[in-house]
């Protein structure tokens, strides 16, 4: 009986320690991601990006972002924590409902065409 308990403990202890370290690693990664997200939202550059998103001219044929690509590159070099946010920012630009642009980013002629193309739900438009 004692031998059985010893052999079982040799089998289960590595498994339990492996699971424990996996769990610790998971919570550490979640904490690190949350910490970097908090840092990102406290950056003044985040305010600049959100104001740029709000200032996009919806009547324009293309997305006119109010800062140059060089300035964006300099922001990325100085604040690399913003890189994941920029993917979200780009997705927000594509999905922003603007006049002749649908919320999915493909052009429509007018709202009636949009209603015929997709099931129109006014609550989806911001």
UniProtKB/Swiss-Prot annotation:
It comes from the Eukaryota. Residues 31-73 are cytoplasmic. Keywords: Membrane, Transmembrane, Transmembrane helix. The keyword Transmembrane helix applies. The chain crosses the membrane at residues 10-30, 74-94. It is found in: Membrane. It is a multi-pass membrane protein. This is Putative uncharacterized membrane protein YBL062W. It comes from Saccharomyces cerevisiae (strain ATCC 204508 / S288c).
């Amino acid at each position: 009986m004692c031998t059985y308990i010893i052999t079982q403990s040799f089998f289960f202890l590595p498994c339990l320690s492996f699971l424990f370290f996996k769990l610790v690693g998971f919570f550490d990664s979640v904490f690190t991601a949350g910490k970097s997200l908090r840092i990102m939202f406290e950056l003044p550059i985040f305010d600049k990006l959100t104001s740029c998103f709000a200032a996009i001219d919806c009547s324009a044929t293309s997305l006119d972002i109010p800062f140059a690509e060089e300035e964006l590159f300099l922001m990325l070099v100085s604040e690399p924590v913003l890189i994941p946010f920029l993917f979200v920012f780009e997705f927000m630009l594509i999905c922003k409902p603007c006049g002749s642009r649908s919320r999915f980013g493909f052009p429509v002629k007018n709202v009636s065409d949009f209603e015929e193309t997709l099931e129109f739900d006014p609550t989806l438009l911001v």
